[in-house]
Amino acid sequence: MKAGCSIVEKPEGGGGYQFPDWAYKTESSPGSRQIQLWHFILELLQKEEFRHVIAWQQGEYGEFVIKDPDEVARLWGRRKCKPQMNYDKLSRALRYYYNKRILHKTKGKRFTYKFNFNKLVMPNYPFINIRSSGVVPQSAPPVPTASSRFHFPPLDTHSPTNDVQPGRFSASSLTASGQESSNGTDRKTELSELEDGSAADWRRGVDPMSSRNAIGGGGIGHQKRKPDIMLPLFARPGMYPDPHSPFAVSPIPGRGGVLNVPISPALSLTPTIFSYSPSPGLSPFTSSSCFSFNPEEMKHYLHSQACSVFNYHLSPRTFPRYPGLMVPPLQCQMHPEESTQFSIKLQPPPVGRKNRERVESSEESAPVTTPTMASIPPRIKVEPASEKDPESLRQSAREKEEHTQEEGTVPSRTIEEEKGTIFARPAAPPIWPSVPISTPSEEPLEVTEDIEDRPGKEPSAPEKKEDALMPPKLRLKRRWNDDPEARELSKSGKFLWNGSGPQGLATAAADA
C-alpha cells in the first residue's frame, strides 16, 4: 500500500477475518494488495464494532443492511486510500457485482443487499471459520481459481466408524475440536496435502453413510437444506454467535478429504457436475476444484481447447475432475488421420481482365475468320460496321491500344505515328460498304496477301488456347518477333492489316 495510508488492521484474536494472500487483487494491480469491496463488506459484517454501521438482516439468508452508508463509504475510502470516497461511488461498485452475480439489491428496501451465497459461493453455504487458528495457504496460485477466497480447516475425521453425536456441534465441543485440529501434527500434514492438491487426497475412501447419519443427527431449522448429494461433498465446519447470520453452525461435520479445497465465489457458484448451465466461470482453468501449474494439466487444457470445436459437448471443460466421473474419450484425435485421405486441390487463379478480354476477342474472331478461309467475297461483304455490334468494336479498339501501351520495345515516336494514322482517318461508317466496290482490283490482291501470310501468323486451335493463356507481354513479343512484315507495315503507316484482317478493319472503323 501507499506510505502513510491508514489501513484497517486485521485483528489477531477471535472475531478476526483471515484472508489468504491471493484473496487480494494482485493480478490487476501488482504490489498494491487491494482487497475487493465484497470482501471488505463481509469483513465489516464479521466485526462486532461495526454492527451500528452494517449488519445482517434478521430472518433473511445472506441479506445485509447498510445502516450508515456514509460511514461505510468512509471506511472503504480509508482502506483504499481514497479520501473522496462517498456512497454514490460505492453503490456504483456494488452495482457492478449485480452482473457478476455476487450480490443483488433487495427491492423495496433502502440500502439493503443480498449475497447470492447459495448460487455463487457453493451449493452448501461456506461456513467461514472466524477462529484465528486457521492456516493461510502460502503456496496458492497467483490467479483466482475454482476455489473460495477463504480457508476452512477440516475437523478430525480420521475414524469414519465413529458415530456422530447430536451434541457434537455445541460451541465448546467445536472449540475443542478446533484446538485439536490446530495442534495435531498429523492434521498439518493433511492440510499440506490439501494445499498441494495431491491426487491421493481425492481418492481417499470416506464412508458416505456416516455423513448421511450426520445429516439426520443434528440440524438447524432456519438453515436452507440442500439435496443429500451436495451436502457430503461441500461440508464445512464453523460457528458464529449471531443466530441470524448465515455463518451459523453447520449440521454436517467437515470431512478431511473430499472437496476441502474451496470453491471460488467470484466465479460460477455451483460446480458443473450439478448444473450444466453455461456461465463465464466455466473455463477449463476454473472448472477443476484443485488447480496446479502441472505440465500434464496444461497439456490437457490445451488439448481440450483444440478439440472443443469438434466436440464441445464432450470437451473436458464441461466436466470438473471428480473421482468416479468417467469422461468419454475425445473424438478429435481421429481428424488428422482422416484429413490425409483427401488431397486438397487448389483451383487456378481467376483470369485477369486483360486475359479475359483476349480470350473473348479470340473467340469472337475465330468464327469470323473460318468462313473467310472458305469463301473470300462474303468475308469482305459481311464486315460492314453497321452490322457489327458497337460493343465488340469498342472492345477490339481498347485491346489494340493496350497492345501499343504494353509494348516496351517500340519507340514512342512509332506509337504516336500509329495513333495519328488511326485518329486522322476521316472515313465514316457509310464509306466502308463501298470500299469493296470502289477498289475491286486492289482488294483481291490484299486479301490473297493476307491469306498467304495467315498460315504463318494464325495458329491452329490448340496454339490459340496457349496464346490465350500466355501472358500478354510475352504473346506480344512473340508476335512481334515472328512478323517482320507486320513491323514494317506498321512503320510505313499501313496499320490496318497489322493484326488479323477483319479485326484491324473493325478497329479502324470504330476509331473513325
Swiss-Prot record:
The keyword Transcription regulation applies. This is ETS translocation variant 3. Residues 136-222, 336-512 are annotated as: Disordered. It is found in: Nucleus. It comes from the Eukaryota. Coiled coil: none annotated. Residues 158-184 have a biased composition (Polar residues). Residues 35-116 bind DNA. Belongs to the ETS family. Residues 380-406, 453-468, 479-491 have a biased composition (Basic and acidic residues). GO terms for molecular function: DEAD/H-box RNA helicase binding; DNA-binding transcription factor activity, RNA polymerase II-specific; DNA-binding transcription repressor activity, RNA polymerase II-specific; RNA polymerase II transcription regulatory region sequence-specific DNA binding.
